[in-house]
Structures are given as C-alpha cells and as structure tokens.
Amino acid sequence: MTKFKNKILMGASVGRYSDAGFTLIELLVVIGIIAILAGVVIVAINPARQFAQARDTQRWSNVNSILNAIGQNMVDNHGNFTCGAGALPTTTMELGSGANNYNIEPCIVPTYISVMPMDPSTGTSTATGYSVVYDPTTRRTTVGATGEVTNPISVTR
C-alpha cells in the first residue's frame, strides 16, 4: 500500500500550474476580430440612411393621406374642392397656417383625416413640409414633399 501512496504523491504536481485558459494575446486577437466585424456590420447597415428611409416612408404615407382627404372632400362636393381658404392653388404652395401657405387643415381635419400630417423632420403647423398644386386642365391634384433619400416625393391623382 505504501508503494501505491508514493506513486499518487509523485504524480501530483506541487508547484506546477495548469495550462488551461487563454493567454492575453489570444484574448486581444479575439477582441480585435470582433471589433473589426462590428465596424463592418455598422457600415453595412448605415443607421443614418435607415432613419432617413424611415422618415421618407412616413412622408409617402402622409402625402397619400392628404391626397385621399382632398379626394374625399371633392367627392362629397360633386367634384369641387370646398374650403374656406379658397380653391386648390394652381401654383405649388406649401400647406400650413403660415402667411404664404395654403391652410387646408380646417377643410379636411377632422372630417376626412384625424390630424394634419407634418414632415417628420421639419414640419410645424405653420409649415407642414408638404405642398399642393391643382391642374385645372387635367383636373389632377399633386401633393408632394422633399425627401431625404427619395427626392421628390409626390403623388398625383
């Protein structure tokens, strides 16, 4: 039995340390690779462009909403747009309550649309960021906006 005990004790490594684990260099290399991959992914995704595209999508939706409200007003009034601000402008005018703007809000809100849409970046109640023009020859109305990625944004009906 003594021989067995001696063999066990001799096999024990007193004073030696284990080789398990990672060295500092290995950890730094892995962190460097992760940083490079993260940089490539961020550049590929381009968050600024993604946000700009999201705002342009909102502009497309708002332009369609305004044009639908104008169309519904015209349907209810036998093909004529009825508004206290007067007939639809035949030259391009910005929508809003400002001095040189066409104030369409009282004519379509809340009957045809719940709230007057405003540009997601710069729109205010005095200058919504959306414009309107009516062509009496073709009887078509165009509502538009300035986009960030897609420029211009406009819908004609």
Q: Which ranges hold each PLM region?
A:
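Short, contiguous, well-ordered secondary-structure segments
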Residues: 35, 66-67
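Short, low-complexity, Pro/Ser/Thr/Gly-rich segments in the mature regions of secreted, periplasmic
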Residues: 144-157
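Aliphatic-rich helix starts adjacent to a transmembrane/signal segment
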Residues: 44-63
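N-terminal leader/signal peptides at the extreme start of proteins
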Residues: 1-22
